[in-house]
């Protein structure tokens, strides 16, 4: 029990720096558009030929998906997103590589940023709009970017780890090499704690 509590504390101490930083960046960007610039829905700022800043409230999930179900979705999304964040945090505690730890931290940071919007404002504020000729990408925010980055990190980490396992199965790595790689991962980001088994 003590070891579990210790691991929970260590994971929280390390991940909170990343997560809180991402949440602050996300919320400051939204505050700047909503309160400081005092924009109103429908206003648009053309930044480049393919990038606009727009004022949009998203009543669905990331990138505006499922917004047509808003009349009964906000409470459901609040509960669902909270449960997802808790589950992701559980997975992060069990993470065995720096890549998965960082990936989960980014996804959680982005999810919490949007969760704050939904809890206090009833919807998520989106303002980044990419478009090219007749193609228009759904409007999103920095929290969505963090989630996407986190997913990319997790995918890359999964395939990197899978490659090492496959190479070991083929006999290309011996146990000493595997342990050396594990030790390198531990020392790189976890100060020697037993994150990699």
Swiss-Prot record:
Active site: 126, 144
Record field: catalytic activity: Release of signal peptides from bacterial membrane prolipoproteins. Hydrolyzes -Xaa-Yaa-Zaa-|-(S,diacylglyceryl)Cys-, in which Xaa is hydrophobic (preferably Leu), and Yaa (Ala or Ser) and Zaa (Gly or Ala) have small, neutral side chains
Matches recorded under InterPro entries: Peptidase_A8 (IPR001872)
EC number assigned by the record: 3.4.23.36
GO biological process: proteolysis
Pfam family, one: Peptidase_A8
Family: Belongs to the peptidase A8 family.
UniProt name for this protein: Lipoprotein signal peptidase
Encoding gene (name): lspA
């Amino acid at each position: 029990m003590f070891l579990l509590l210790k691991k929970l504390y260590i994971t929280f101490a390390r991940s909170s720096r990343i997560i809180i930083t991402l949440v602050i960046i996300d919320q400051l960007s939204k505050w700047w558009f909503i309160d400081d610039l005092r924009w109103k829905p429908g206003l648009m700022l053309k930044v480049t030929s393919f990038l606009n800043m727009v004022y949009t409230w998203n009543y669905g999930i990331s990138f505006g998906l499922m917004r047509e179900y808003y009349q009964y979705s906000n409470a459901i999304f609040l509960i669902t997103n909270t449960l997802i964040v808790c589950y992701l945090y559980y997975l992060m505690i069990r993470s065995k590589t720096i890549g998965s730890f960082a990936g989960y931290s980014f996804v959680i940071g982005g999810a919490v940023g949007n969760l704050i919007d939904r809890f206090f404002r009833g919807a998520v504020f989106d303002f980044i709009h990419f478009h090219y000729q007749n193609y228009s990408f759904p409007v999103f925010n920095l929290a969505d970017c963090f989630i996407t980055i986190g997913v990319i990190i997790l995918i890359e980490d999964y395939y990197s780890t899978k490659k090492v396992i496959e190479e070991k199965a083929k006999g290309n790595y011996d146990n000493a090499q595997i342990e050396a790689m594990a030790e390198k991962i531990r020392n790189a980001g976890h100060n020697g704690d037993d994150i990699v088994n």
